[in-house]
Amino acid sequence: MPSIWGKVPQQNKNFTGREDLLDKLHSGLRSDVTAVVPHALHGLGGVGKTQLAIEYAHRFRHEYDVVWWIPADQSVLVKSSLAGLARELNLPIAASAGVDEAVDAVLDALRRGEPYERWLLIFDNANEPEDVNAVIPRGSGHVLLTSRDQGWQSVVDTIVVDVFRREESVAFLMKRVPRGITEPDAHRLAEALGDLPLALEHAGALQVETGMPVDQYLRLLENETTRLLGTSKPSDYPMSMTAAWALSVSQLMERSPDAVELLRCCAFFGPEPIPRDLLDRLPEDFAGGSRLAGMLGDPIRMIPAIRELGRYALVRIDSETRTITVHRLVQALLRDELPEPERASFRREVHTLLAAAVAEENPDDNAAWPRYQALLGHISPSRVVQSTDPRIRHFALNVVRYLYSSGDFRSARQLVEQFLERWQAVSGDDDQYVLSAQRHQAIVIRELGEIQESYELNQRTAARMRQVLGEDHEETLLLINSHGADLRFRGEFALAFEHDQDSLRRHQAKFGPTHRRTLRAMNNLALDYLLLGDYAKARELQAETFMYQRQAGSGSSAQNVLSSWNGLARIVRLNGDYRRACDIGEDAFEYGVEQLNSEHPWTLRVAKDLSIARRRNGQLEEALDLADHTFDAQKRNVGINHPDTLAAALCLANAQRAAGQLTEALELLEDMAPRYPRMYGDDHPFKYGCDTNLALLLRVNGQLERALEIDRRALRGLDGRLTREHHFTLTCAINLASDLAALGDTEEARELGVSTLESLRNVLGDDHPLTLAGAANLVVDLLALGREDEAAGLKAETLTRYERQLGTDHPDVKVAREARRLDFDFDPPVL
């Protein structure tokens, strides 16, 4: 056995023939001695591609150290299956690491051949190449795919799998039905069934279970064919297969009508495993109108029905995972034989079962995410999008919310746009669930970095909600709270503050003072206070919000708790208490990794702010390492042109500068600076903040005139948007004074330093590190102008306060003690 043998289905003891295909596949894979060239088994459904791959894995397993099976029929599930190999390979990643991080580690380990060079990965039922090709490893091992998609023929070495040759069909039936069939009868059956392996398997299972004579089987097959031909059938499935299937169901109906009813219901799920507990008793508010409610509530009926389906090889029962799987071919045939009213009835049943399964589960709650994940593969195949039932639409939007709450924004967008297209066409623009879907859509596209589109969509939707639902409807309030983020992203901080004050009042009146939704509104208002520079009020409100959210029974989600936790660490840092900010940030980061995973969007946002706190606290190496990791993760997860990635880039450039990597920092900022106006506009505070950082790096790299020009322009912009009495603006003013001093304009630098220091004391207080930096820089200018007595007095006072605030060994204190200039930079907060 290989050292790692993962998820490979059991070997089929009735496997027959295919020796030429196995030899061709084996020799083809073994011939690739320098680099892996994937091979694909291609053919229509039911020809035995999967069985051939299973047989290959078992027959040649001695040639591999690792054999890993990956169900690949839905791209959303491929990565999670591949990520499971990380643990088996004992890769050095955190147990709470995200799926993408685990997949990257697995692909890298396979590419390097460490710890194993001989590996085989089997992607079963792969769809379009672009869905899977990105996660196919390259290295010294082998990759085998099975697929019905002809597109693989232009991508990989492909082996076409056709129906059995007649002698293989006969040999298979003789093995499958020992002592129950003659060779001539096997020939007759193979002819009638078109030599399709799946059809032969079903026929063989029926023969074994019932002992039916072949003549009777063929007569029934002929009689059932006429009815089946009267309904539509999939174009790539032969008639003989549909006839064989219908006969199996007909015989099963005589033994267990309940089993047939259950099977038909399962045909309207997706082809992924169906959790067994979906078929448990329905809650009372869902049981009304359910055609299966009686059976679902009676294990004496349900258990035998499931076992009958297994005996007839119509489902695969996995007792370990407690799931039931119906082959997609069987599902298609089952659906096609039913009249449309029956199809609609079974679809409603499946929708009810799906919705009931998570009726009590909050999609924001990370504890509920595995449950939602298990249902994800059934949403589109069951046509949830077509339902007009309010309970089902509510469930559908909860799935969207689960996706973006867990960080899968792209899948959330794809799903909600499918819902909107259908629901608007059926129900019109004023339907409550259409409006709610648009609210979710705006959240998703904002999280994907399309901030202007989110703003415009929320503006339109808010107007419709107020008109259709009313000012104080729950959906209207939820959108109002979300829309505050749009205003913050636009740099309209004062308008966002007014908006969020009103939102909080409405939430308190509607939900109460400590409801989880009210606490979200409080968190947003605390951020507004921060952006407007009122750090005392921001700290008070943020601490109150966090206290309520952390209480047992608050109902707040892990990501909302983490957002508030990080907000508290950030405001403590901006108040100048760097050591305590690090402590709070460390706790928040550990919570994010544990509750969400290390690459969840909110965990990465916390990591970015923790890096800033470490840098401010003088922990330069730790800050740089964390900033570098965070920037790489953001690029990988959301791309370079995203607000979180841009913020992580500034954090990294600042950490590089602090660590002395001046050239690298400047190169990064030269790339980032043009992206900020494209994201936020030409007159946004964050754009000016990025320019401030760029100017700083230009000056320390010797480009003095350009630095001065950029800082002057940035200061004018910040004066206009935020006024001079703001933390961001005063930071730019400190750096502009340093530009002037570097160019020899010492007196102008001193004058700017004096006015800036006065404002810093008024805004931040005498002991804030930024105030002390302004004072320390003014000391340098006074010394350069020969005003030594004035400089000495200011220096002594500044150092006393600095050492008390940051300690004698802090890098900034050392610079001030040596009468050298201090530089400060800008870090955009999470909005």
Show which residues each predicted segment covers:
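Aliphatic-rich helical/repeat scaffold segments used for oligomerization and domain docking
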Residues: 1-425, 429-440, 445-467, 490-505, ...
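Short coil/turn linkers that connect adjacent helices within long alpha-helical scaffolds
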Residues: 386, 425-430, 467-472, 505, ...
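Conserved alpha-helical positions within TPR/SEL1-like repeat arrays
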Residues: 397-404, 432-447, 474-489, 516-531, ...
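Eukaryotic intrinsically disordered, low-complexity regions
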Residues: 460, 464-467, 471-482
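Eukaryotic tandem repeat interaction scaffolds
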Residues: 593, 604, 615, 627-776
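C-terminal non-catalytic interaction modules
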Residues: 766-769, 776-777, 784, 788-831
